[in-house]
Amino acid sequence: MVPKPDGSRRLCIDYRNLNDCTLDASWPMPNISAMLQRIGSQKPRIFGTMDLTQGYHQAPLTMQTRAFTSFIVFCGVYQFTRLPFGLKRAPSYFQEVMATFVLAGLIHITCEMYIDDCNVFGQNTEEFIARLKQIFERFRKCHIFLKASKCFFGYTEIDFVG
């Protein structure tokens, strides 16, 4: 268990051996400069940023993949049913799930997503709220939860991916 900045703890599994024989990610990670250019080209005036609660743990694993995440503790053998930290392809897989399933058709238009950070923007209040509603509806349907203390809405500028 590794302590997190907020005082809670994170279970960490050493997946180095698995990662050594895992193929490189097939889904590309977003280019931050390109994301910022896309946002800027829409000339937004209102911004919001959302942080997913334990982002990776909200992405389900296939039955085949679960076996590879097995780990042993004093009371038994367990495997993850959701994406754990430490896997070589975890960032890419999570990004793919968000882009092709959860927020399909919204990324690059309504919002930008980088791992578990979602940035929404609009030229005016009405557009911003309409976009937020679209994103919230997708998150609701897909059972994606946000960390309220890390969500900020209605700002004229925000920190994103940093």
Predicted features by range, described:
Residues M1-G162:
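Retroelement reverse transcriptase polymerase core
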